[in-house]
Amino acid sequence: MGVRGLHGFVASSCPHVCTVVNFKELAERHRSQHPGGTPTIVVDAMCCLRYWYTPESWVCGGQWREYYSSLREFVRTFTAVGIKLIFFFDGMVEQSKRDEWVKRRLKNNREIAKIFHYIKSRREQPGRNMFFIPSGLAIFTRFALKALGQETLCSLQEADYEVASYGFQNNCLGILGEDTDYLIYDTCPYFSISELSLDSLDTVMLCREKLCQSLGLHLADLPLLACLLGNDVIPEGMFESFRYKCLTSYASVRESCDRKGNVILAVAEHISKVLRLHQGEKKLEEMLPLGPNKALFYKGVASYLLPGQKSPWFIQKPEDVVTLDKQVLSMSSDPESKQEFPVCMDSESKQKLPVGTDPEFNLEAPMCTNTEVKQEDPVNVGPEAKHQVTVVLDPEILKVARAQHVQAESYLVYSVMSSGEVECSNSLEDATDQALPSQAFVYRPVRQRVYSLLLGGGGGGSSTGPAVKEWFVYSGNPLRQPDLVRPLQMNIPGGTPSLRQLWLSQEPGIQAQRLDTLLACFDLSSSREELQAVERPFQALCCLLVYLFVQVDTLCLEDLHAFIAQALCLQGKPTMELADLQLDHIDPRAVQLATLLVRGLTTLVLVNGACGSPWEMADFMPWHLFDGKLFHQKYLQSEKGYTAEVLVEQNRSHVTRFHTLKSVVCKACGKESRPIVSRRHWRPHHAGSRQYEPDQWRRY
């Protein structure tokens, strides 16, 4: 993440850039300097997931109760010293960073393959050096933090820009994260999450002013340096020959630095001693070998400019207007609030700021002049840029979706409605297991019905509505382009209600309509009565299990027993007891089953939000319904043929509930002509009859 090689360079060659600080002391100093103000830290949550996930077990699907406790302790520690935390999550992938996103996903695929190879050969979880965050962690962390009373925001563009903007505009104490881009932005101080000691509240502050002193640069030079070294916008190889030329003419090569370190020093010297001589006189393309990449390069440099900031590397021409592919977003919880810097209300808004490069580049400026949505054609800045066409035209509905997205109250809904493009990162799935399909395929029909609901899909099975671009990771998908997925017709008794009805209506009976719509997304309208009779929080679980077992015909009765038993036993079980649970061994199939269930819960977040929230969000949060190790234990026991009484640990009330929930799921599956039978009735290595070849889905 961030600038290529900069983290290692700072750690090895510029240790004085890193200073140990104490958050309690910083907060006290901030209060004395700003009486009445609350010391606030902006947290780049995506950078912190690995730090927050402290449970020892990570391969079984997630230790969600332990994780929730870890988050609660993190929040409590900062609250105790009077520090307010604002959490930001990535809400979208910018087009200029899509290639980098794909590269990381393919790299993650290789890491996951190694994890499953290890599990199969050792029958145990790999060490922390192979750690991979549990599926759905980022999504559920948002809701966990909100449940803990924290202000949690989801970005409308790359989160690091919004984090830096918020810190810059609100005089924050600092940014907490792990991304060298925060050394490049001219914003509030940057603190390392990986160096944080929660016991003492000590961490490391990385000082961009000291970095500039070491490199002989000014703060305004750092965006230029970042792009010449390579970052998430500019591929590292783009200026490889240029960096080599800088290195060959660099006279002060340090033996204490590795080659990458000397390259950084050489490029910095070239900026300070060669390029700066012509700053303000020559355009960048006259001083650098930009070639056909000049628009992308200008865009990369400008992407570090926060609201109101200018770059001395852009020749000032007041008549020229730079239009950056970026928008400044309202960071306030009140979408109507007025701020010092105007706020763009939609992705079509154009923001203009006279930072004055040559108009042929037509980059976007990080500022807009009003909050009106302007329906004007975007200027093409090259093949890497993509204009997001708003798919939903009802401005009130789009405004509601946007507000819910920013407040981290929904998942994927606004992305579908505003750009028609969604993504889902890697899951712990075994690419060699032909019997279990990827979660991307299992839940695709649900997503298709949601697309129909959100985009107004027509009838006749596969809709003629606009296709949604899906960047979902699954085995065999090279991610060279998105899958084009058409909406699928909804079958709802009485017809499909409008989004205005589902989201805005207060009429009596609307809650029943919302539930009907949710069940129709899972194609389970016929089982409404049975599912409604189930007590909370098991309604959502049963809905998910029925859908799973209908979709995946390689699931058996033993799997159902394990899913139900772990959900029942989880209720009231102390967190420490879950943490102390020991497993005989790790089964790769159980790992993937856990992934299927957890990804089902994230799908429920999408569906529930799209349908106007007929169910309370808490009913399908994993810390209420799922524990990875507990499920794994029940799976291993069920495989051995343990009775229901043993599976639910001899708890009489659990035995009754177990049979009730099992009956509901089996009866609902029976209506879909899907009997659930024991594995003992199968022939060896039963692979199921459904085919999940990627190409059949691409036809959509």
Swiss-Prot record:
Name of the protein in its database record: Constitutive coactivator of peroxisome proliferator-activated receptor gamma
InterPro entries linked to this entry: Coact_PPARg (IPR026784), PIN-like_dom_sf (IPR029060)
Classify the main location. nucleus
**In the record, which residues are listed under signal peptide?**
none
- What is the native source organism of this protein? Bos taurus (Bovine)
Q: Which GO terms describe its biological process?
A: fat cell differentiation; peroxisome proliferator activated receptor signaling pathway
Question: What is this protein's gene name?
Answer: FAM120B
* Cysteine pairings via disulfide bonds: none
| Taxonomy of the source species | Eukaryota, Metazoa, Chordata, Craniata, Vertebrata
Q: What keywords tag this UniProt record?
A: Activator, Differentiation, Nucleus, Transcription, Transcription regulation
Q: How does it assemble?
A: Interacts with ESR1 and RXRA. Interacts with PPARG; in a ligand-independent manner.
Q: Which family does the entry's similarity section mention?
A: Belongs to the constitutive coactivator of PPAR-gamma family.
Function of the protein = Functions as a transactivator of PPARG and ESR1. Functions in adipogenesis through PPARG activation.
Gene Ontology cellular component list = nucleus
Q: Where in the cell is it found?
A: Nucleus
